[in-house]
Amino acid sequence: MAFISFPPRHPSSSARLPLTLIALDDWALSTITGVDSEKYIQGQVTADVSQMTEQQHLLAAHCDAKGKMWSTLRLFRERDGFAWIERRSVLEAQLTELKKYAVFSKVVIAPDDERVLLGVAGFQARAALANVFSELPNSENQVVRDGASTLLWFEHPAERFLLVTDVATANMLTEKLHGEAELNNSQQWLALDIEAGIPVIDAANSGQFIPQATNLQALGGISFKKGCYTGQEMVARAKFRGANKRALWLLAGKASRVPEAGEDLELQMGENWRRTGAILAATQLDDGQLLVQAVMNNDLEAESVFRVRDDANTLHIVPLPYSLEE
């Protein structure tokens, strides 16, 4: 029996989100297994996976030789290897790049479409899951395994959980929360990631940015002490020579349409508007507010005013839940 996804509805902000079960169809799961899996993935991503415990998950970037990100990966350990979650739109291209040198190692790299990705967020999310699972993750143990399920804990923008599970458990959870929880699609999780300042790399922006342009260093996603990995020289240069002049920003406001990933924005300069930045993700909330995640210059004034191109409405900067000060 397959897992049936949920119909779309406008997402809510974390502050107003009722208990919600979210089908994460826009994200995809992949795995690397085999005796060389740790050594191999260590040579491909920005984070130091050798230091990662069974109870941790982390965000890392997979870069090209120029240090530009193919994608960001939410990594965690699994059996004799690792699993990761990324945007479905970049899955195929990212796996193709990751497999390029796999012929020289004892590893198997593959997408995993058998399992289901679900999010649980909103009012009393922990209490709802406690009725289903014997143990839940928290700030100290961010990853918990329970039977066929792996549960990942997220702190921002408010406590939420990501479940990697089988179809039977996904259907059981949907049934148990029926009538108690709202059901929504990937847009709700996307809205929460945007609020949390977690970079969203879709196909339109793959190969465009170094990790620091999306604040990955502030999210613990870059190790400057580990050994070589693809793109390391350019990522290190950006830090030690101050070559990175960009950052990820959260904007909120109104617009007559939801812009696409890859579009630019316009910055108000006196009476005029100047094109700036690149949109990573955007979504419209149920109260009409537009949330936009964009890469722009890292020296913007906090009071800067923006707009979707040629739109009559405006957007403003919203503080992120972490600091970029090093």
Swiss-Prot record:
GO cellular component, one term: cytoplasm
GO MF entries: folic acid binding
Compartments where located: Cytoplasm
Entry binding sites for folate: W27, W189
Pfam families linked: YgfZ_barrel (PF21130)
GO biological processes: iron-sulfur cluster assembly; RNA modification; tRNA processing
UniProtKB keywords: Cytoplasm, Folate-binding, tRNA processing
Xref: HAMAP family: tRNA_modifying_YgfZ
Function: Folate-binding protein involved in regulating the level of ATP-DnaA and in the modification of some tRNAs. It is probably a key factor in regulatory networks that act via tRNA modification, such as initiation of chromosomal replication.
Similarity field: Belongs to the tRNA-modifying YgfZ family.
Name of the protein in question: tRNA-modifying protein YgfZ
Species of origin: Salmonella typhimurium (strain LT2 / SGSC1412 / ATCC 700720)
Name of the encoding gene: ygfZ
